[in-house]
Amino acid sequence: QLMHAGAIASNDRKAFLFPAQSGSGKSTTTCTLFEEGYHYLGDDYILVDTDRNIVYKLYGTTKMEWDNLESRFPHLLSATINSQVRPNQKGILYLGAQNSSIISNTIHAVIVPILGSSDSGFSRSTVPNSIMAVAPTTLHHLPHHRNESYKKIKKLLSKTPNFIWRLPKDKKHIIQQFHTFQNESI
């Protein structure tokens, strides 16, 4: 099943999905964790086997607003593959080659990132909340079989732990909170 979400994996091959609408912190989260040494599976589109709970790297790309790239990831600006369209489109970076040997991992949690909250941290979430984070964009971009795709997405989210992550403002705290979450919650 094609899915609009971010995904990273730890060295012990546990994958974490980050489904979210544009502008919610999905790219910031996946790129920050990639820089910390997590394996990058994708941030725009990924492929998910909903029967086996496995996520596959598809394109290995990320799309990010130029101002976010400049402020949080200035060292990645030179890696954009579409700098000629600036500022009319998001910057596109190909991060997939950095860890091309890691192409699939078992999904251990679905984490919906939220930017702009005064309190940061993780909390348990519901399947409907996660569905609302992934289904609208994913289904909108699919030309056919939307009802079947919706059922597959719901099936995956129903058998996977769901969380909300109110993101801290700085990268250091994103990393600290994720390490704590990974070590204590799963």
Listing of model-derived features with the role each one plays in the protein:
Residues 29-30:
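Post-Walker A alpha-helix
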Residues 24-26:
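Conserved glycine(s) of the Walker
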Residues 1-2:
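N-terminal pre-Walker A segment at the start of P-loop NTPase domains
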Residues 6, 10-21, 35-186:
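Glycine-rich, often acidic-flanked micro-motifs
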